[in-house]
């Protein structure tokens, strides 16, 4: 004989504590007459009692620490990979900076040909740019792989890369005079130049 499904639902309600008194009476009457349902009810009762007992069992205080010690240690490469995935913008900026600094440092080692940015009112002799006495050069002068001797006036900045500057007592420069002979000075100069060019293109 198959028991109706409502008896199983009554059992569940009983263990949940939601069973009304009339439902409890109906369940008890059925359990007296059906041995299979009584056995099932008894098994459920044992299971509920076991779960209630197990809920009060606590792990030893050092259990979590011992489990963490027993776990395999995380490799440094996994930690680095996780950091790179969590911070993509920082990773991209760092990579860009490293490549930029690397290219600037490598271009420092490549000593190119002599060049000068101004050719009016100057004399060029054996990789030396001379601003003659009584002459005024308007604008900035950049000398690469050579030297500059200022006897006149420069109305702007003077930058010497891989070279020397010589100032006569009568020579004047209205702007800054900068000698770049080290790699870090070269990198800083290029960063400033690129930044100034970017600002000029925005304007």
UniProtKB/Swiss-Prot annotation:
- What processing steps or modifications follow its translation? Is processed by three successive proteolytic events. First, the extracellular region of RsiW is cleaved by PrsW (Site-1 cleavage) in response to cell envelope stresses. Next, it undergoes cleavage at an intramembrane site (Site-2 cleavage) mediated by RasP. This cleavage uncovers a cryptic proteolytic tag with conserved alanine residues in the transmembrane segment, that is recognized mainly by the ClpXP protease, which completely degrades the protein in the cytoplasm and leads to the induction of the sigma-W-controlled genes.
Quote the cellular component terms of the Gene Ontology held in the record: membrane
Q: How does the protein associate with the membrane?
A: Single-pass membrane protein
Keyword field contains Transmembrane: yes
Q: Which InterPro entries match?
A: Anti-sigma-K/W_factor, Anti_sigma_zinc_sf, Znf_put
- Quote the subcellular location field of this record: Membrane
Required co-factor(s) are: Zn(2+)
Major localization listed first in the record, in broad terms: membrane
Keyword Transmembrane assigned: yes
The superkingdom of the source organism is Bacteria
Give the record's GO biological process terms: regulation of translation
Q: Where are the transmembrane segments?
A: 87-103
User: What family name appears in the similarity comment?
Assistant: Belongs to the zinc-associated anti-sigma factor (ZAS) superfamily. Anti-sigma-W factor family.
Protein name listed in UniProt: Anti-sigma-W factor RsiW
The scientific name of the source species is Geobacillus kaustophilus (strain HTA426)
**Taxonomic lineage of the native organism:** Bacteria, Bacillati, Bacillota, Bacilli, Bacillales
């Amino acid at each position: 004989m198959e028991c109706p499904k409502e008896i199983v639902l009554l059992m569940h309600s009983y263990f949940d504590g939601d069973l009304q008194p009339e439902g409890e009476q109906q369940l008890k009457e059925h359990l007296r007459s059906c041995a299979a349902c009584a056995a099932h009810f008894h098994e459920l009762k044992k299971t509920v009692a076991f779960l209630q007992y197990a809920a009060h069992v606590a792990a030893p205080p050092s259990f979590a620490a011992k489990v963490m010690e027993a776990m395999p240690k995380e490799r440094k490469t996994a930690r680095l990979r996780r950091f790179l995935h969590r911070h993509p913008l920082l990773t991209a900026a760092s990579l860009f900076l490293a490549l930029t600094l690397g290219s600037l440092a490598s271009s420092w080692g490549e000593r190119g040909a002599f060049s000068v940015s101004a050719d009016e009112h100057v004399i060029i002799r054996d990789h030396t740019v001379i601003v003659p006495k009584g002459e005024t050069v308007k604008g900035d002068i950049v000398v690469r792989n050579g030297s500059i001797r200022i006897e006149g006036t420069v109305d702007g900045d003077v930058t010497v890369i891989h070279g020397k500057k010589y100032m006569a007592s009568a020579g004047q420069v209205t702007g800054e005079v900068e000698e770049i002979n080290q790699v870090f000075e070269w990198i800083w100069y290029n960063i400033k130049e690129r930044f100034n060019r970017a600002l000029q293109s925005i304007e």
